[in-house]
Structure formats: structure tokens, C-alpha cells
Amino acid sequence: LSSAASDVYKRQAVREVNCVMEQGIYGLLGVNGAGKTTLMRMLCTIIQPSEGEILWNGKEIWKLGSAYREVLGYLPQEFGYYPDLNVYDYMMYISSIKGLKQAFANRRIKQLLEQVDMWKFRKRKMKHLSGGMVRRVGIAQAMLNDPKILVLDEPTAGLDPNERIRFRNLISELSENRLVLLSTHIVSDIEYIANEIMLMKDGMLCYTGTAEELLASMQEHVWLCQVPRNMVENYMRKYLVGNIKTSENGAELRIISKEKPMAEAVLTEKNLEDAFLLYFGEKSEER
């Protein structure tokens, strides 16, 4: 992406994005409204950049047209389906839209539904699937054409913790020999599987690199502090507080600060949640 930008509803939702991506998993992390979905729609040729360009193997994706979309798989945050179609028929419908030959589609659908553990539910109507099942069918349809680029927009939205873990493992399994871009506002979605992390704020990429490099770049330290309950609000006003664990004897605060917040504060290891809080000024959703 070279100086890529996009205006949505007369507001610049994406501004001056510059990055180079290769094979591997890229975690695009940011709060809601940061511009993640707009950027992904640009990468999937749904929205055309108002400025800059997006290249695939040195060629502009809008000029490549269908040749680019043939190597692209996309799972939007909300994807439509005919509720009365069963899983297999839905996959066949998407195969026909993608121009896949029927014999190949039959083999590919069986392979993918087995991979996402949905083959045994192939005759179940889409409207009768759980949220996790729908997401699994969603990633299967995105993989029908064996894409070199797989774009996943908030793929774990609405899933329970067990389904999120299962989905992360599936994404890691599918990432071999392809570029996977996964957007989320939940740190744990990418903490253990992303090769590189991209932090997006106010439509701009404010960091691109590994999790280890991100944590090493933090000048702030992370401290554990035991304080009386009636002092919690004072510390929250003065410091960036990540977690609060209350007990009968008071509260344990996880504080991000360059300086030791109190004499009894204990230094602890930084994690990606701390970096998220430092960059965005708010906590990620449930880990």
C-alpha cells in the first residue's frame, strides 16, 4: 500500500497508509471506528482509494480486476446468505459465483467443510447454525478458490471464548503459503498467531512490526500495586490503569508508567494488552 487513503461519508476514514505485506499472518489491531474495515474493503476492491495505490506483485489491483480477485478470499464481519439454503448448497452457490467448475467445487467443498469440522452439518440450513458455525462456513467459503490473500474482518466477533480459540487455531492452520490479514479489536485474537502486528488509530497505521519489537519499544514499565479500595479512583485519574483486581484487603492495580507509582510497586512483564492500552488509551475487549 502506497499513501493509500479513502473518504467515507465526507470523512477521511483511512489516511496515508504505507506498508508492504508478504506471506504470513498480519494482525490489524485497533478500536472500533479506527478505519480497519474501510482498509480491508479497499484491499478487496469494494472501495476504491481516493488517494494513493494498492499493488499486488507490482501491479495496481484495480487494473488487475478479476485476475486479482481470483487470488483473493474475503470474510467480512457480516456476510449475507440465504437462510433456507443448507450449508452444502450455500457453498455450491458461492462456488458458482466464483466461477469454479462443478467437479472441482464438489471436491473442494468436501475438503474445506471437513477442515472446519462442518461436513457433518452440510445438510443443515444456514438459519439453524450457531454463530460459531456460521463463521466456520464463512472462512470455508473464503477458501474455496485457494486464495493467496485471505482477508478476515473481525472473524471472532460474537463468538464465545472456546469458539475464538478454535477459530484462531484454524486461521493459523490455513496461513501456510498465503498472506492472511486479520482485523480485530480483541488482543487475544492475534497475540499468539500473528507474525506481524499493525496498530491502526484514526485511519492511520501507527505501528507495524512484531509483538516483541512493539513491547521492546515501550518506554513505559508495567507495575503491580496494592492499594486501599478508597484510593483506586485517585490512581486511575493519575495513571494509565490496565487491570483492577479487588479483594477484601484492597485492590491490585496494573499500572503502565515510566516511573514507579508507589514505593511498594512491583515491576512485572509487559504484554500486548499493555501496548494496546498505551496506544489507544482504552482496554481491549475480553481476552
Where are each of the predicted segments found?
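Conserved ABC ATPase "signature" region
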Residues: 92, 96, 103-121
